[in-house]
């Protein structure tokens, strides 16, 4: 029964790492709330979860919809009264190229989804996480957060700012049981990677499933430093 399970929220769960992580969590007897912009992708994820005997709830959501994020938090409270696990995975690559060529609207779209929507998630889920005795939050970042690589513009900037924001939130919660960590998944076979590196040999990349197993392993690890950044390739 769902009442006896931990409750997790996974954003960007319609494909890639988000989908694989949701499936992996469900296999650990966690009820997973899966969000994403594409309903068909969420339905595929849900079908895979059910096939393995797991349970999930679809909450179709565009991360640009900040009011929708708030509404999701309220619905989670009404239905379950708490949130045990938050996996913030949703992100967009945007347009790669020189900064001075990037249109403001394209730049802001990346910042909105990769950074500001995460602030809204923190606002909406903080109290719910603190109602749990388990209380874990994990944010997917990128190696580009620490590497000012040419032409990665808004994406790299958004991930660098995300890391800083999450570390601040972790510091603000150093005296309670809410565990907050950041993960750099490394080179993985995802849509974002394919868009950024067209023609790359996929065989040399990790699969989303391989990354998901390590993410879920970190979630159930008893001792991690708050605000710590984990490089999946080194785990």
Regions found by a protein language model. Give the residues of each.
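Catalytic loop of short-chain dehydrogenase/reductase
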Residues: 92, 130, 134-174, 187
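Conserved NAD(P)H cofactor-binding loop of Rossmann-fold oxidoreductase domains
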Residues: 89-95
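Conserved glycine-rich cofactor-binding loop
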Residues: 14-16
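The beta1-alpha1 cofactor-binding region of Rossmann-like NAD(H)/NADP(H)-dependent oxidoreductases
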Residues: 60-71, 104
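C-terminal helical subdomain
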Residues: 178, 182-183, 190, 198-235
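Conserved glycine-rich Rossmann-like NAD(P)H-binding loop of the short-chain dehydrogenase/reductase
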Residues: 28-44
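Substrate-binding pocket helix/loop in short-chain dehydrogenase/reductase
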Residues: 97-99, 103-111
């Amino acid at each position: 029964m769902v009442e006896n399970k931990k409750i997790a929220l996974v954003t960007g769960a319609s494909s890639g790492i988000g989908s694989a992580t949701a499936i992996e969590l469900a296999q650990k007897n966690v009820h997973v709330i899966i969000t994403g912009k594409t309903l068909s992708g969420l339905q595929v994820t849900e079908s895979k979860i059910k096939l393995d005997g797991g349970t999930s709830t679809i909450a179709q959501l565009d991360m640009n919809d900040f009011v929708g994020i708030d509404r999701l938090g309220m619905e989670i409270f009404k239905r379950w009264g708490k949130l045990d696990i938050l996996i913030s995975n949703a992100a967009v690559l945007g347009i790669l190229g020189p900064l001075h060529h990037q249109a403001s609207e394209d730049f802001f779209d990346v910042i909105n989804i990769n950074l500001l929507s995460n602030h809204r998630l923190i606002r909406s889920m903080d109290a719910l996480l603190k109602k749990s005795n388990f209380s874990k939050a994990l944010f997917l970042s990128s190696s580009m957060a620490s590497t000012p690589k040419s032409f990665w513009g808004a994406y790299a900037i958004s991930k660098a700012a995300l890391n800083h924001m999450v570390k601040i939130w972790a510091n603000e919660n150093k005296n309670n049981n809410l565990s907050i960590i950041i993960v750099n998944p490394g080179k993985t076979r995802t849509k974002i990677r394919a868009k950024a590196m067209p023609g790359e040999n996929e065989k040399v990349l990790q699969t989303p499933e391989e990354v998901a197993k390590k993410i879920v392993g970190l979630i159930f690890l008893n001792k991690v430093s708050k605000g710590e950044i984990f490089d999946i390739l080194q785990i």
